[in-house]
């Protein structure tokens, strides 16, 4: 008898683990394979089924199953972080999974007091509330926001111009819960207790949730089919120097890197030499191209001097490049938690910056403000910077800006074309990214260095998220990546032209200049705010119910 029970338990456990693996695989595919975003619309069903079966079987320690499910999903989709930092990659996988599992655990806890569909509604809105919180948290890693599943299925989500990516998260939850609800009612027999009208309403509602967003997307997308043919445009020259960041200073000096970059630019600009009548052109260099910039003292930089000297022959050319930049501060006291002591009352603040310059030496600078945890940013600096000092300063201490600022392309008559420049990781943050447009950006640029991850899905995912930003803001993007993939992206998110990975390349094209603002730009992340509000209300109701008994 005991043997039969043991065999039965093994079968039950096997079913649960199969559902765990099925969830992880289905939800990973949209992040890895183009045009598979629709899988996310039912990818959560195995996880929900696992939880329901485990509850019916009165399994103990169900958290092991759902935590394992999230770990496997995170590992399959973001393993590539380990190429840059093994410790950071493992921390991202396990810590991110822990937060997901905590949200799911809260849902299981709510089932003790909430009945019917309410616990599942609580799960959906709390998950989206957590995603919204994650965008602004000190330790932030919103890579696997459910709405990002459609980053390479763009035809289905042109309505992101209204909702942003969290609208996609809501769609994922609505479809999964709708289908799961129908499956549950069929499996427990309650479906047969519904009258014809109730059955029709359930099926119709489920179909509407699934199909209507596709129709809306098609209707909205038609408005922008000629978006690249705007009355005004900016010519861009994207230069991908293809310099291995792991050997950046061992293999080549900065002067040699400058020479490589300028040689590539000169070949494309030959016809513009000393032409004062040509339309302005913007040249892009990648993130952290140089590391010799002192803020406010640009003429001390060999790279800056070399660039401005080169540009004197091209009065219509503006150059945007990335740099590690520094502020030196003389103070008897530490000016900030992130400042590093240099000695004799001198302190150093570091930045990951984008600079715009031209033949006149005019220089504008923007500091990246959404920073990679540990690599660039020490979270909760009042606490962890002190610990980091004791460890010898192993964590990044970059500082950003309090608010976004724009960079200006100038023509030969001194007229400005305001553009935004999202530096690398900033392009993952949808609502933050809209600030560039609200400030007046007529087009967008992204500069990045994705080579740290090697030839993995990481740089492809990063590129695809830029397409979502284009849809949300309806601004074309010129994207420059050190080793690829550089691209020109239309306001519909379509990649108009692109370079190859790990290849020196120059990409030339025009990006339209626009002044309109989408609903998402004007109003922000309404989906996230509403879900946060509902989550708090339901959580308070849950606490009250627990305290009442």
Describe the residue ranges of each PLM region:
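Membrane-embedded alpha-helical bundles of multi-pass enzymes
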Residues: 2-224, 455, 469, 496, ...
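Membrane-interface segments at or immediately adjacent to transmembrane helices
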Residues: 152-156, 209-283, 292-312
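Intrinsically disordered, low-complexity coil segments
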Residues: 55-59, 187-201, 225-230, 270-280, ...
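Solvent-exposed soluble domains appended to multi-pass membrane proteins
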Residues: 253, 280, 285-549
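Generic structural signal for well-ordered alpha-helices
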Residues: 103, 107, 265-269, 404, ...
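Short, conserved active-site loops that position catalytic residues or coordinate cofactors/metal ions
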Residues: 31-48, 73, 240-241, 278-295, ...
């Amino acid at each position: 008898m005991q043997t039969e029970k043991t065999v039965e338990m093994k079968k039950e456990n096997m079913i649960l683990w199969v559902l765990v693996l099925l969830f992880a695989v289905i939800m990973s595919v949209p992040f890895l394979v183009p045009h598979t975003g629709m899988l996310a619309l039912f990818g959560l069903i195995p996880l929900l089924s696992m939880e329901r079966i485990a509850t019916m079987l009165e399994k103990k320690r169900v958290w092991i199953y759902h935590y394992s499910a999230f770990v496997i999903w995170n590992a399959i989709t973001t393993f590539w972080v380990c190429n840059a930092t093994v410790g950071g990659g493992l921390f991202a996988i396990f810590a991110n999974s822990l937060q997901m599992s905590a949200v799911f655990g809260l849902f299981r806890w709510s089932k003790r007091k909430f009945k019917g569909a309410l616990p599942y509604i609580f799960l959906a809105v709390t998950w989206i509330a957590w995603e919204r919180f994650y965008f602004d948290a000190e330790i932030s890693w919103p890579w696997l926001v459910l709405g990002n599943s459609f980053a390479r299925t763009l035809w289905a989500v042109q309505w992101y111009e209204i909702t942003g990516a969290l609208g996609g998260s809501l769609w994922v939850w609505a479809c999964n819960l709708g289908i799961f609800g129908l499956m549950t009612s069929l499996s427990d027999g309650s479906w047969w207790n519904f009258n014809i009208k109730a059955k029709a309403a359930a099926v119709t509602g489920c179909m509407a949730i699934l199909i209507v967003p596709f129709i809306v997307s098609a209707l909205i997308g038609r408005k922008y089919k000629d978006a690249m043919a705007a009355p005004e445009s900016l010519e861009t020259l994207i230069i991908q120097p293809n310099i291995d960041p792991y050997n950046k200073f061992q293999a080549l000096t900065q002067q040699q890197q400058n020479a490589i970059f300028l040689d590539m630019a000169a070949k494309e600009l030959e016809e513009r030499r000393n032409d004062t009548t040509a339309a302005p052109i913007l040249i892009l260099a990648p993130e952290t191209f140089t590391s010799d910039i002192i803020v406010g003292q640009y003429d001390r930089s060999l790279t800056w001097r070399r660039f401005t000297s080169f540009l004197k022959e091209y009065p219509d050319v503006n150059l945007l490049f990335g740099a590690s930049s520094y502020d030196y501060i003389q103070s008897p006291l530490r000016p900030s938690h992130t400042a590093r002591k240099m000695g004799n009352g001198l302190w150093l603040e570091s930045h990951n910056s984008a600079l715009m310059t031209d033949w006149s030496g005019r220089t504008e600078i923007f500091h990246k403000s959404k920073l990679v945890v540990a690599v660039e940013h020490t979270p909760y600096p009042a606490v962890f910077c002190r610990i980091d000092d004791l460890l010898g300063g192993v964590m990044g201490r970059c500082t950003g800006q309090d608010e976004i600022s724009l960079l200006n392309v100038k023509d030969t008559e001194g007229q400005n074309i305001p553009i935004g420049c999202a530096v690398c990781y900033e392009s993952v943050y949808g609502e933050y990214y809209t600030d560039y447009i609200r400030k007046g950006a007529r087009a967008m640029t992204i500069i990045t260095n994705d080579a740290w991850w090697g030839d993995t899905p990481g740089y492809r995912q990063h590129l695809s998220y830029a397409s979502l930003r284009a849809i949300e803001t309806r601004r074309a993007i010129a994207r420059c990546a050190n080793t690829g993939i550089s691209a020109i992206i239309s306001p519909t998110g379509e990649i108009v032209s692109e370079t190859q990975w790990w290849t020196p390349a120059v990409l030339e094209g025009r990006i339209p200049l626009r002044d309109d603002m989408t609903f998402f730009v004007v109003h922000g992340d309404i989906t996230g705010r509403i879900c946060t509000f509902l989550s708090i209300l339901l959580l308070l109701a849950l606490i009250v119910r627990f305290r009442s008994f």
